[in-house]
């Protein structure tokens, strides 16, 4: 296969953009509201909502914790977003001779957006900063009067005045968590992106790594290998779990509702995966790799109505969106 033909094919493919969207045929389930009276001031109301995209293999599990505090002039909602986002991994064809490719889960995005007026705002969230740890753990605590604290670990920072607590705990080997740039008082979002990936002791490599001769060696097994192209990738089990399997997100957001505002509001929760295209080719002398970022994007959104007065939620809509280069 000639190089110019390969380059033209790659360019033509990258220039083509296909955008497909529509309402998902997703099943949603909401549990009955459970009530827990902490004391004569604070009452907790809890319900869990699930929505799935079978097509994209994305599952949202949202836990809504309403906090009614007589010593505070606002309503508080602690929303925990968990579930599953499949990587979309597609392994290479082992019979490919001098050119082969695979698709891998390079980045996962989760966001929560308040669709209401100024009566409902995002006032806190976790994680709060960039995190490159193998395991991300945070604990949120709510104390009387609307005070919120977020600490590292699964129990640190709590005291006897804590009326409610919630934790997050997820793994991100070779990936890192960053806060979305458009995070503000109406939106909060996180990205969990491939960051430092080792290849048999070499590296670390990332999505943008580049060697002037061998290109991006992210998943390249050997520069001078005599194997077929489809067999010259590192073994699948050597790839980071998030690149080839699933990501199980756990994020927290805190929404505050002014009691003299509208009794109902809307929020939209978005789960997304970005798949990169990684390919290798033999040029007659050596193997070289190339990584094309965000080659396929799959997005699943759910919109809920929040009933602040009755501490209930209602699934209004779900939407699936595909974006292919």
From Swiss-Prot:
One of its GO terms (molecular function) is toxin activity. GO terms for cellular component: extracellular region. Residues 1-25 form the signal peptide. Disulfide bonds: none annotated. Keywords: Cytolysis, Hemolysis, Signal, Toxin, Virulence. GO terms for biological process: cytolysis in another organism. Transmembrane segments: none annotated. It holds the Pfam family Leukocidin. Toxin that seems to act by forming pores in the membrane of the cell. Has a hemolytic and a leucotoxic activity. Promotes host AMFR-mediated inflammation by mediating 'Lys-27'-linked ubiquitination of TAB3, TAK1-TAB3 complex formation and phosphorylation of TAK1/MAP3K7. In turn, activates host NF-kappa-B signaling pathway. Belongs to the aerolysin family. Toxicity requires sequential binding and synergistic association of a class S and a class F component which form heterooligomeric complexes. HlgB (class F) associates with either hlgA thus forming an AB toxin or with hlgC thus forming a CB toxin. Interacts with host AMFR. NCBIfam families: hlyII. This is Gamma-hemolysin component B. It comes from Staphylococcus aureus.
């Amino acid at each position: 296969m000639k190089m110019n033909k390969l380059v033209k094919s790659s360019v033509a493919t990258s220039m083509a953009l296909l955008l497909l969207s529509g309402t998902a045929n997703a099943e949603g389930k909401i549990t009955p509201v459970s009530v827990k009276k902490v004391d004569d001031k604070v009452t907790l109301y809890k319900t869990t909502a699930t929505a799935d995209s079978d097509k994209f293999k994305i599952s949202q599990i949202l836990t809504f914790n309403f906090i009614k505090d007589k010593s505070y002039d606002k309503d508080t909602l602690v929303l925990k977003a968990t579930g599953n986002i499949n990587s979309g991994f597609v392994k290479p064809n082992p019979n490919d001779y001098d050119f082969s490719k695979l698709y891998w889960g390079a980045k996962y995005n989760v966001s929560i957006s308040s669709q209401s007026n100024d009566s409902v705002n995002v006032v806190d969230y976790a994680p709060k900063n960039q995190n490159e740890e193998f395991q991300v753990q945070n604990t949120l605590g709510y104390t009387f009067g609307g005070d919120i604290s977020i600490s590292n670990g699964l129990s640190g920072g709590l005291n006897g005045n804590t009326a409610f607590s919630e934790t997050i705990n997820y793994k991100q080997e070779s990936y890192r968590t960053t806060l979305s740039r458009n995070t503000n008082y109406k939106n909060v979002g996180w990205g969990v992106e491939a960051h430092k990936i080792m290849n048999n002791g070499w590296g670390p490599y990332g999505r943008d790594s580049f060697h002037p001769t061998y290109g991006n060696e992210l998943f390249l097994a050997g520069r001078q290998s005599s194997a077929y192209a489809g067999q010259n990738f590192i073994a699948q089990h050597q790839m980071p779990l998030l690149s080839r399997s699933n990501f199980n997100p756990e994020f927290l957001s805190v929404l505050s509702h002014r009691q003299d505002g509208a009794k109902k509001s809307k929020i939209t929760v978005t789960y997304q995966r970005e798949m990169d295209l990684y390919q290798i080719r033999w040029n007659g002398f050596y193997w070289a790799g190339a990584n094309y970022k965000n080659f396929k994007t799959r997005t699943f959104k759910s919109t809920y109505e929040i009933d602040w007065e009755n501490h209930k939620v209602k699934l209004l809509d779900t939407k699936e969106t595909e974006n292919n280069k």
